[in-house]
Amino acid sequence: ITSVKVGAFTGAQNLDRVSLPSVKEVHYCAFQNAAITTLDLPWGELESIGFSAFAGASGLPQNPVFSKLTALSNGAFAGTSDNKNTQLRTISLPLWTGSSFSEGSGFSNSIGGIFAYCTALTSVSAPELQTLPSQMLYYCQALEEAVFPKVSTVNSGVFNYCTNLTKIDLGGAITRLSSAFMAYANKVTAL
């Protein structure tokens, strides 16, 4: 199996382990709100992750390095105000430039809120990313450092309520900075 299709495990309950060692694509809502003790995927081999693919899911790794990921869509790992993602600690996206996973008609290619409400996330880096999507790290209250050296556009709400964020590396070539991109991120000392 190289592709997990739309909604495949949405809302699944009481699964002890899901092991899919050859997966390259995870389509939208594939694991949304799935209660899985261990989600064994080749995180470093994934190439595309769709809309809300892992939103509200359990069994996620703490420190994934998405070595081959080139497409990432809206809400992929997001929590909510009532169901926060407390699993992810660090995120590395070495190849992602900002592309989303196009999954056909009826699917939004918006890439906002990807890690919203990931309240245990402490650091994120995406060295090739050029545009920070809206609300990408909204309410990531443990976030301390964000590294995006090639970013030129920062959309709204990216760092809102990141109350422990102290350092943002944007590389110094910003051409567009949206309003309210870091509301209540009051500890930022370097930008």
Task: Walk through the language-model features, giving the residues of each.
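Structural signature of tandem-repeat unit edges
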Residues: I1-S3, Q13-E25, A34-S48, S58-A71, ...
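Consensus positions within tandem repeat domains that build extended binding/scaffold surfaces
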Residues: K5-T10, H27-A30, G50-A53, S73-A78, ...
